[in-house]
Design a protein with these regions (language model features):
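Short, charge-rich amphipathic interface segments used for partner binding and complex assembly
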Residues: 1-2, 163
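Juxtamembrane segments flanking the first transmembrane helix
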Residues: 2-103, 108-115
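Extracytoplasmic/periplasmic sensor domains and loops in membrane signaling proteins
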Residues: 77-80, 108-144
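Short strand-connecting beta-turns/loops that link adjacent beta-strands
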Residues: 99, 141-143, 155-158
C-alpha cells in the first residue's frame, strides 16, 4: 500500500510542478513581451523628439541664412555646412525640399539619394502644416525603414520650403 501512496504523491507532485512551471513560464513570457513593447515605444518617441529638435535647429540655420537674401534665396554653402554639422553629430540626414517635393539641399552633399526622388504631395502638405512625423521608406527614398520628421520653413505665415530630418 505504501508504494501506491508514494506513486500517487509523485504523480500529484508532478502535476502541480508542471502547472506551476507553466504558469511561471507564461508570466515571464508575457512580462518580457510587455517590456519589449514599452521599450520600443519609448525608443520611437525619443527618436522622434530628437529628430524634431534637430530639424528645428536646421530650420533656424536656414532662416538665418535666408534673411540676408530677403528670404528669396538659400545660401547653399552656409546652410549646407550647418546641416552637415548637425547631421554628423546626431547621425541624422537633413534635407531641404521645395513645395513641389524636389530636394534643394542635403546634409550628404550633391550626390545623395534624396535628389533622385521627389517627396509625394501629401507628405509635403502634412509637413508644410507642421504635422509630418512618420516611419517608412519616404516614398522609396530609403531602402529600409527610417524615422522621418518634416517641418515647414516659414517667413511670417508663408511656407517657403520644407525641411526633413531622418534616421534609421
Amino acid at each position: 500500500m505504501s508504494k501506491i501512496k508514494q506513486s500517487l504523491r509523485k504523480s500529484l507532485f508532478n502535476r502541480y510542478f508542471a502547472l506551476c512551471s507553466a504558469v511561471t513560464l507564461a508570466t515571464v513570457a508575457i512580462m518580457g513581451a510587455l517590456v519589449i513593447g514599452f521599450s520600443a515605444s519609448y525608443f520611437s518617441e525619443t527618436t522622434r523628439a530628437s529628430l524634431r529638435k534637430n530639424a528645428e535647429q536646421a530650420v533656424e540655420i536656414t532662416l538665418v541664412g535666408m534673411e540676408d537674401y530677403g528670404y528669396q534665396k538659400v545660401p547653399v554653402s552656409t546652410v549646407q555646412n550647418g546641416y552637415r554639422i548637425i547631421s554628423s553629430t546626431t547621425e541624422t540626414q537633413i534635407f531641404l525640399v521645395n513645395l513641389e517635393g524636389k530636394t534643394l539641399l542635403c546634409s550628404e552633399g550633391e550626390n545623395c539619394n534624396h535628389r533622385t526622388y521627389s517627396i509625394s504631395e501629401d507628405i509635403i502638405k502634412k509637413a508644410a502644416a507642421g504635422e509630418y512625423d512618420g516611419s517608412g521608406t519616404l516614398g522609396g527614398i530609403y531602402d529600409t525603414s527610417h524615422y522621418t520628421v518634416g517641418i515647414p520653413i516659414k517667413h511670417g505665415e508663408e511656407v517657403l520650403a520644407v525641411l526633413f530630418a531622418s534616421t534609421e
